[in-house]
Structure formats: structure tokens, C-alpha cells
């Protein structure tokens, strides 16, 4: 039988706790993201995005930079007025979090799957794909 060094056990424990903490931190960043998105908070959204972020909108074949995204907030603010956004994390591992999000606009709703890559406390990549034209699958 092999003896496991207490140092190895300690190192493994610290690594696991840091991964759990990072996953929880990513969840908090995602929660902040949707809260800021709902009220079109340009300052908070800008703070959450890394300067070199790439935001891929699969359905329309567009990749936005941080500057592109922030510039679109005025238009988004009009679209999101009176809306609700519900989201739940489907999985989170290795800095990547996949979210199912229902965008419930006053006249329609849509179900999206969004994947965020978080590093150093900021969103460094995001991919958004439509799942359904309504939120019945949420």
C-alpha cells in the first residue's frame, strides 16, 4: 500500500477548493451580467467584459468586440424595456459556463443558450445561440 504524503493531499484539497471557488465566482459574474443586461447598465457591462472579449452571435453570424457591444446598448435599452430575463446555469467547468436564458420581451419571448468564458474575473468570450422562439422549454 502506498503512503500518500499529507502535502499531496493538502495540495489536492487546495486545488479543488480553488476550482469550486472559481466556479462560484463565475456564477456571480454571470448573475451580474444578466442583472446589468436587463437594465442596460453600460458601466457594469463594460466592467464585466475583458477589453479583448469576442462575443459571437451564432444565429446572425456576427462577432462583436467590446466596443461594438457597448455601442449597441442604446438600441438594446429600447428593446429590453418592460422585459424580464430568466437564466439558469446548465454547467460550469474549466472557466466556461453554459446558461439557458429566457428573454421574455413584452410582445414575444425567446430561449437562448449562452456560453461564457471567464478569466481573471471578466468575460473573455461569449457565444449566443437561439434554442426556441418561446420559453416553454425553460
Model-derived features: positions:
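Positively charged n-region of N-terminal signal peptides that target proteins for export
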Residues: 1-7
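Bacterial N-terminal signal peptides
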Residues: 7-17
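Short, aromatic-enriched amphipathic alpha-helices that serve as compact interaction elements
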Residues: 23-41
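Short, well-ordered alpha-helical segments enriched in acidic and aromatic residues
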Residues: 40-52, 56
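A mature extracytoplasmic/lumenal domain signature
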Residues: 49, 59, 102-105, 130
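A short gly/proline-enriched turn/hairpin at secondary-structure junctions
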Residues: 54-64, 79
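Surface-exposed, charged secondary-structure patches
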Residues: 67-113
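Short beta-strand edge/turn micro-motifs at domain boundaries
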Residues: 109-138
Amino acid at each position: 500500500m502506498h503512503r500518500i504524503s499529507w502535502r499531496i493531499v493538502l495540495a489536492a484539497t487546495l486545488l479543488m477548493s480553488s476550482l469550486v471557488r472559481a466556479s462560484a465566482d463565475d456564477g456571480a459574474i454571470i448573475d451580474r451580467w444578466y442583472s446589468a443586461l436587463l437594465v442596460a447598465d453600460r458601466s457594469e457591462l463594460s466592467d464585466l467584459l475583458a477589453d479583448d472579449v469576442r462575443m459571437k452571435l451564432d444565429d446572425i453570424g456576427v462577432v462583436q468586440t467590446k466596443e461594438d457591444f457597448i455601442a449597441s446598448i442604446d438600441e438594446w435599452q429600447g428593446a429590453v424595456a418592460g422585459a424580464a430575463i430568466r437564466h439558469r446555469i446548465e454547467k460550469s467547468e474549466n472557466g466556461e459556463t453554459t446558461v439557458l436564458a429566457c428573454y421574455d420581451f413584452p410582445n414575444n419571448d425567446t430561449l437562448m443558450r449562452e456560453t461564457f468564458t471567464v478569466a481573471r474575473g471578466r468575460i473573455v468570450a461569449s457565444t449566443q445561440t437561439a434554442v426556441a422562439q418561446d420559453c416553454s422549454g425553460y
